[in-house]
Amino acid sequence: MSYTVAVRAMCEFTAKSGDLDLRFTPAPSSQEGIIGHGIVTSRRDDGYEREIALAGEHGEVAVRGRADGYDPALNRLEEIKTYRGDLNRMPANHRALHWAQARVYGHLLCKMRDLANLTVALVYFDVDSHRESVLTETHSADSLRDWFESQCERFAAFAASEAAHREARDAALRVLPFPHGSFRSGQRALAADVYRAARDGRALLAQAPTGIGKTVGTLFPMLRACGDGYLDRVLFLTAKTPGRALALDALALLRAAHEGAAAGSPAGGASASAAASTAESPPGGASSEAAGGLPSDASSPEAPADPSSEASSPEALTDLPSEASSSGAPAAPSSGASSPEAPAGPSSEAAQPESSPNAQAEAAPSPAVPGAAPLPLRTLELVAREKSCEYPDRACHGESCPLARGFYDRLGGARAQALALRTLDRATVREVALAHQVCPYYLAQELARWSDVIVGDYNYYYDGSALLHSLAVQNQWRIGVLVDEAHNLLDRARGMYSATLDQFVLADAKRHAPPTLAAPLEKLNREWNALNREQEAAYLVMDTVPSALLLAAQRFIGRVSEVMADAPLSIEPNVLQFAFDAMHFVNLAEQFDTHSIFDVTRVEGEAARRRGSRGGRAKSVLCVRNVIPADFLAPRHALARATVLFSGTLTPFHFYLDTLGLPEATPALDVEGPFRAAQLKVTVAGHVSTRWRDRERSLAPIVELIARQYAERPGNYLGFLSSFDYLRRIVELIRETHPELPVWMQERGMDEAARDAFLARFREGGQGIGFAVLGGAFAEGIDLVGDKLIGAFIATLGLPQVNEVNEQMRRALEARFGSGYDYMYLFPGMQKVVQAAGRVIRTEHDEGVVHLIDDRYRRREVQRLLPRWWRVE
C-alpha cells in the first residue's frame, strides 16, 4: 500500500525540533504571504516556472506538493518564505524546516527533469521593505535523493498508523447507529438534507426549531458521510461555549451508541443506514486518503444494512421530500486523488485506545459497554489561548516559558498519548500536555492536524488567519462545516473583518514603549494628527484609508518585529497589543472595498479628558468597519465540500444567503418543529408604541399589561426591553405601582456568577419577572423548561439604534442589495425578537404566552418574519 502526504506536512513531522519560539512575530498574514510570493515571482525572467506540481515516492510513502519556482537558466529551485523583522533573528529550527522542504522539492524536481545537480534556494521576502534575501545550496541529485529517502523513512511508521486509523474509522462510521430509538419530529428531514449536502458537495441553510435535536441531527449525517467516503474532516463551529459543550455531549452519545451496537445492544432503534445513507452509493474509488497517508487504492464501500432495525435500506431516509432536496445530479466526491498536504496519523508507539467516558447529551446515552470496541473517532475541542495558557506572564519561547522549551522534542510522545485517547476535550488535552511538559494550547493546534471532528469557535475557520482554514488549504481536506446558531455569524464575521485603531491607545503606547520604538510611534502620531486637522465633523466617512497614515503604521509594525526578535521582553503588553491592533488594521485597510467603510470618530472635550488627554485635546478613533462579510466568507464556503448553517432563526433566507456569502443556488430547509400553536398564546399590544419619541408614554401601559398577565397566571416571566435605561424605568415603575410583584433585572457588565444568580431565580414553582435587554445574554442560549418560564414580554422590535454609523452601514447595504433598511434594521431586529420569544416553549409539553408590545407588530412585513407555527392574536 502507498501512503500519500504533502511535502510540507511530512517535513513538519520529520524536521521540526527544539523550542516553540514565537519571537519572530508578528508574522505576515496569509494575504501578505500571497502578495509577497507574487511580487517575488513577478521579478523573475520570462523563462521562470511557477507553482510546479511535483510527486515522488519511497517505499510505502508517496509525497506530493508544489515548488514555488524554478529558474532553468540558473538551474535553481526556489522556496519562497515571507517574513517581517530581522532575518538574522529567525530561530534556527524555523530555518531547518525551510531547508528540509526545499531539499525534498529539489529531489522531486531532479527526478522529474532528470537533472544531475541542482541549486536549491531559500528566498526570504520582507513584506515591509520588499527586499529579498537569497540563501543557496548546490547538491547532486544523489545527495538530494538520500535526503528525501531519509525523511520518508522517518515518516513511514506514523503514516502506516494513520492509514490503519482511517480504515477503522470509516468502517465504523459506515454503520454508525442513530443514538435514539426514533427520530424526533423534523429531525429526519434535517439529517437527510445534511447528508445530501455532504454527498453532493454543496451548502445548506437549515432553519430548525428548538426541540428537534439539531446537534445530533447534523453531526450524525456528517459522520456517516465521512464513513461513506465523501468527507475527511468535520468542523463543528459555535458562537459560544455552551454550543461546544452540546457538541461534545452529542459526540459522547454517538460513541455510546456505537459501543452498544458493537456489544449487541444497540443504543437506538433507528439504524445508521436508515438515518444517513443515500439512495445512490458513493462511487468506487472515492478518496479516503485526503487527510493523510491512506492506501491509494482505498475505496468507500456501500454501507451494509443494520440488521437491528427494520429501516435498514439506504432509501429509508433520503428519499423523503424536503425543501432542500437537490434537483440536479449529485456531485461525486473526489476520487483517486490523494491530498498533496495530507498529514499522517498517530505513531505506532501510541498506547492502546481507551474507552470513551460516559456522557449526557440531549438524552441519556447508553452506558459504555465493558469490552465493546470504542468508536475510532478523534474528537478535539479547541479553546482560546487565554483559557489554555499555563504561564500568561511568560513569553512564548524556550528562554521564558518552560512549556515552550523543547516543545518539538517532546511533541511526539504527547501526540501519541493524546491520539490514543480519542476524546480530546480541554481538560484531557491539558492533562496530556502537562504530563509531557508541553504547552496545552499549541499541543491542541498540533492535534488539529490529526483529528476527525474539531469543535471550536467560529473564528477557528472564518477568521482571516484561521488555523482550521489554513490546515484545510495546506492538506486539501474535504471538510464538512457545521455552523451552529448561524444567525450569530453575521455580527461575529463583521467583527472578524473590522479593525479599530485608537489614538488614545497610541498615546499610552508612546509613554511605555522602549526607545527603539519612539521614532516610528511619533511618525504614526504625526500622520494621525494631520488627518485630525482635516476633519471638520465629529464623525467622518472617507473613501480610502490615507496612504501616508498606512505607511507609517506599516513601518511601526516592521520595527516592532525587529525588536521582538531581538529583545521580546523589552516591549510591554499594552505596547505589543497596540502593534497587533495596527497590524490587523493595516491588513484590512489593504483589502478595503465596498464591503466595508472607513470612518474616523473625533473624541474631544470632557470625553477626551476622561481618557487621559491633557486639556481635553481632541484625538480620534479610526475604524475599517466591515458591513458585508460575504466577500470574506464566500471563499471559506467554497473551500469546504459541504457547509451547513443551521439555527432556529434564519428568516428570511435570502438575507443570510446575501450577507454570509453563500452561493445563490444554496437550498434552504425550513424544518417543521414539534410544537403546536395551542402551546403558545401570542398577543400584540397594538395600543403601545416603543419608539424613542413615545418612550415616556409607553411606560404605564407596559407595566399595566405585565401586572394584568401576572395576576391572571402567576409564575416566572422574562421581560425584554431595548436598552438598560428603558429596562430600569420599567422596573422602577413596577416597584412603585405594583410592589407585590417580584422583579429582578439584568445589570451592565454582569460576570458569570451574577448571570448564574439571575437565572437561578427561574425555578420550578417559582414566581416573578426577570427583566433583560433584548439581544443580550438572556435573550438566547438559555433553556428554561416547564414552569421555570411560562411567558415573555417583548417591548421592542429590537431595531438597532439609528445613528451615524448604522446609517452609513445602511447605505452600504442599500448600494449592494437594494434593501438597506430591512438588512440593517428590520431583519436583525426581528431575529432577536424571535430568539427571545423562543425561550418560552422548549419542549412539546411546555405552554406559555408571549406579548409583543408595539403597534408595528400589526404590520404585514413584520408578521411575515414571525415563526409559521405561531397564531398571533
Which sequence ranges carry the predicted segments?
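Metal-dependent nuclease catalytic cores that hydrolyze phosphodiester bonds in DNA/RNA
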Residues: 1-75, 100
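Conserved catalytic cores of phosphodiester-cleaving nucleases, focusing on short active-site segments
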Residues: 37, 65-91, 105
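Conserved pre-motif I regulatory segment
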Residues: 164-207, 220
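A substrate-engagement module of RecA-like helicase motors
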Residues: 177, 230-281, 349-454, 462, ...
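Signature of the SF2 helicase/ATPase Hel1-core->accessory helical subdomain module
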Residues: 218, 224, 245, 436-453, ...
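A contiguous, basic/glycine-rich beta-loop/short-helix subdomain that forms a polymer-engagement track
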Residues: 429-454, 465-472, 562-689, 697-704, ...
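Conserved RecA-like P-loop NTPase helicase motor core
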Residues: 686-697, 748-856
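Conserved helicase motor "Helicase C" RecA-like lobe of SF1/SF2 P-loop NTPases
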Residues: 722-747
